[in-house]
Each structure stands twice: as C-alpha cells, then as structure tokens.
Amino acid sequence: MTRKIAIYGKGGIGKSTTTQNTAAAMAYFFGKRIMIHGCDPKADSTRLILGGMMQTTVMDTLREEGEEGVTLDRVRLQGFGEIDCVESGGPEPGVGCAGRGVITAINLMEDLNAYGDELDFVFFDVLGDVVCGGFAMPVREGKAQEIYIVASGEMMALYAANNICRGMVKYAEQSGVRLGGIICNSRRVEGERELIEEFCARLGTRMIMFVPRDNIVQKAEFNRKTVTEFAPDSEQAQVYRELARRIIENDHFVIPTPMTMDEMESLVLKYGLLDLGEAS
C-alpha cells in the first residue's frame, strides 16, 4: 500500500531540499518507487530531482487548456531514481488563492489515479506553516497519513512546528493523520540537538533525524542535483540514507500534544533563544 507523507515546516527551513534528498535516497539506496507532489506556488519542490528543470504545473495547464488538458503525460515528469514529479503551481500573482490551487491539483491527480499502488511513497511538499485551509488539506482530509515536520533550533522554526501540531490535533481524529516525527535540519544553533529532543518530548514525538549542516548540500544544489546523485559516497548522502531508512521503518505515529505559548516561551528561554527583554 502506498504511504502518503506530508512534509511541513517554516518557510525557508529546507523542506524542499530535505524532501528531495530523502526521496532520492529512498529510490537510490532502497529501490523504492517515489512520487513528489509539490504544493507550493513557486513550483520548485522537484527541481533537484529533475536536474534543475521547472516543469509545467497543474494550475498553469488548467488555466491554459481546461480540465481536459490536465493529463499525467502533461503534468508528470520522471527524474533521478525514476521519481515521479508533479507541481501544483498556483494562481497568477495577486489573483486567487494558492491554497485552493493545492486542493484542485490534488483532487485532479486523484481523479487521474496518479497516486497508484505501484508507488511505495508519495511526498507532499507543503508551503510553510498551516496557514489556510488549502495548505492544511493533506492534514484535514487525510490525503496524507503521515506528517513529518522540518525544524531547527531557531525560535521561529519551533513556533511554526508547534503551530503545525496544533493544526494536526484539530483534524487528527477525523482524518487519521499522525505525526511521524521531527526532522532537525541543523542551523548550528548552540545546544540545538538537546533543544529539539526536549521539544519533541514535550510534543509526545521524537526527533527522527538530526541532519547536520554541510556545504555539500549547496554544492549539489548548484549542480542541480540531490546529494545522493551528486556524491552518493559522501557522509551527507549517508545521513539522508539513514533518514530514508528511519522513515521506511517508522512505526511510531502519534497525535501530538502542542505546547501553550507560555510553555514555548519557557523552553526557548531555557536554551537562550529569547532573553527576558524580548519576552516582555
């Protein structure tokens, strides 16, 4: 059965990079059949898998050719590791709702049976925080069964992760979606690992992987590749391999217990991310 996973996190935290590198590791090291469905109007969730190519989005095709023009041949491309790639896209700037575009694109892909049983994993790479109903759709309507949140030891990344968990709790009972863990995409913050581990414990989940910061990630991106394709024998490729393995073997799924604002403030104060002047 296809496992459907949504990756959330604060804007700029590295969701797309983490998703693509994890998917590439699953395909290359474990032979898994993967699809990435980008749910961001920037349509950049699959560019490393596709060698830097910006593909035609579902919403662009829908606007230009109508619903009958949206076929898998038009909007689905295959890249590294035979990973299938789809981008939702969004409305023209200043017009319409990008969240509605996510809803429309996912529904169209379901109608076309894009998430078929031949796939082992489908990843939904979702824009930023749970900011509106459209971007919360993978959680709200059970389009994804598993959620992983990309965070770091930075204050705003933790606040965003906590807010995402609050959104999950609202819909978890009706949709069956569960939190699979937190992926720490390290920013080299002092005490970062310990902070994330305590943060996860407060949420009732675990840090599924600590991804160290390594310049080879940027070098691979400059060459329009994932780390696995660019340098499969590198230490960082092995980090993504281990992250892929842990997700494949994960059986620890929970409804999180988000913190109150006072609890969040206490946590970041404990680790020196917020001084008392800022807190007042």
Curated annotation (Swiss-Prot):
Biological role stated in the UniProt entry: The key enzymatic reactions in nitrogen fixation are catalyzed by the nitrogenase complex, which has 2 components: the iron protein and the molybdenum-iron protein.
InterPro entries: NifH/chlL_CS (IPR030655), NifH/frxC (IPR000392), Nitrogenase_Fe_NifH (IPR005977), P-loop_NTPase (IPR027417)
Chain positions recorded as ATP binding sites: 9-16
Cofactor note (record): Binds 1 [4Fe-4S] cluster per dimer.
Origin: domain of life: Bacteria
Binding site for [4Fe-4S] cluster: 97, 132
GO BP terms, alphabetized: nitrogen fixation
EC number: 1.18.6.1
Modified residue annotations for ADP-ribosylarginine: 100
SUPFAM superfamilies from the UniProt entry: P-loop containing nucleoside triphosphate hydrolases (SSF52540)
The family this protein is said to belong to: Belongs to the NifH/BchL/ChlL family.
Record's keyword terms, sorted: 4Fe-4S, ADP-ribosylation, ATP-binding, Iron, Iron-sulfur, Metal-binding, Nitrogen fixation, Nucleotide-binding, Oxidoreductase
Reactions catalysed, as given in the entry: N2 + 8 reduced [2Fe-2S]-[ferredoxin] + 16 ATP + 16 H2O = H2 + 8 oxidized [2Fe-2S]-[ferredoxin] + 2 NH4(+) + 16 ADP + 16 phosphate + 6 H(+)
Name the UniProt record assigns to this protein: Nitrogenase iron protein
Organism of provenance: Desulforudis audaxviator (strain MP104C)
CDD domains: NifH
Quaternary structure and partners: Homodimer.
Gene (UniProt): nifH
